[in-house]
C-alpha cells in the first residue's frame, strides 16, 4: 500500500509501498480517505531534536484521519464494516493507575499513532477498536479528519468555566483558533487571541473572536481597556509554547484567574511566580483529549452548530504531500488536508 514514511534519519518524508498492516482480534482495519498534517508531523519531517530522540526509523507517520472500516477483528463488538470513523491517536495500556481509574488521557505508558507505532499516512490503518470513533452522518469528511486537533482545542477550552468570562488565547495556530471558536460558541464574553502571524490572526477573525491582536504592534493592556475590561482576563488558554506569551498571559490575568497550558515550550521556561502566587492563579496542564468525554462533547458541539471548517485552508492529493508539508510549515495556512 502507499504510505508516507520517515525512512531516513535526516530531514524529509518519503512515499513508499509497504504491506497492509495486520490487525488483531480486538482491532479494526480502516481504509484511509483523508488525513491532516499536524505540527508533530512537521517536527518529524524537519528531524529536529525532539524527533531524533523520539521517532524510531522507519516509521509511517500521521495521526489525524478520516476513513471507513473494511475489516473487523473477531472479538470486536459495536463496530462493523462500512462505518465512517475517526480515532483517538493515543493508545493506552489499560492497567496503570490512571487507566484503571478511567483517566486514560493520563496513562504513563501511552503510545502515539504515527509516533511510536505505525500511523495513518497510508492507505490502511490498524487500530484498537476501543480507540475507534464511529461518526454520525452530519460530520463531514474534512471535519472528521481534524477531530484529533479539535479535541486538543476542546479539552483545553472546556478545562474551566468560560460562560460570561473574558478569555485570552495566546497562539493563533489551528488549535488556538478552534479553541477561540469553542469558547465563543459556549458563551464567553470577550475572546482575545494573540500572535505575531497576521495570516493566522485574520483566520481567527473569521472564527468570531472579539479581537485578534498582533503583539508586535499592540499591547494587551490597551486591548483590554478598549473592550472595557477593568480587572483582567478570567481564563487564559496558552497555545503557543512561547515563553514571552506565557508571561504576558500571567500579567494579563485577573486575580483568581484560571490558566490552561497546551503549548509546548522549546526549552525550560522561567515564570514570574509572583504573578501566580499573589494573584492566586490556578494553572492546569493539558495533554491530548479526555477519553472519551472530550470526543462526545466536540461531536455534540459540531452537531449544535459550531463551525470549524474555516480553519481548513488547503486540500491536496497525497501525491503532492511535499508541497502540502511546505505550506503547513510556512505558517501561511490553517489545517492542511491530504486526500487519499
From Swiss-Prot:
NAD(+) binds at residues 175, 195, 200, 262-264, 286-287. GO terms for cellular component: cytoplasm. Binds 2 Zn(2+) ions per subunit. Its cofactor is Zn(2+). The keyword Cell membrane does not apply. SMART domains: PKS_ER. Zn(2+) 1 binds at residues 38, 63-64. It is an enzyme of class 1 (oxidoreductase). Its main location: cytoplasm. It catalyses: L-threonine + NAD(+) = (2S)-2-amino-3-oxobutanoate + NADH + H(+). Its EC number is 1.1.1.103. SUPFAM superfamilies: GroES-like (SSF50129), NAD(P)-binding Rossmann-fold domains (SSF51735). Homotetramer. GO terms for biological process: L-threonine catabolic process to glycine. Belongs to the zinc-containing alcohol dehydrogenase family. GO terms for molecular function: L-threonine 3-dehydrogenase activity; zinc ion binding. This is L-threonine 3-dehydrogenase.
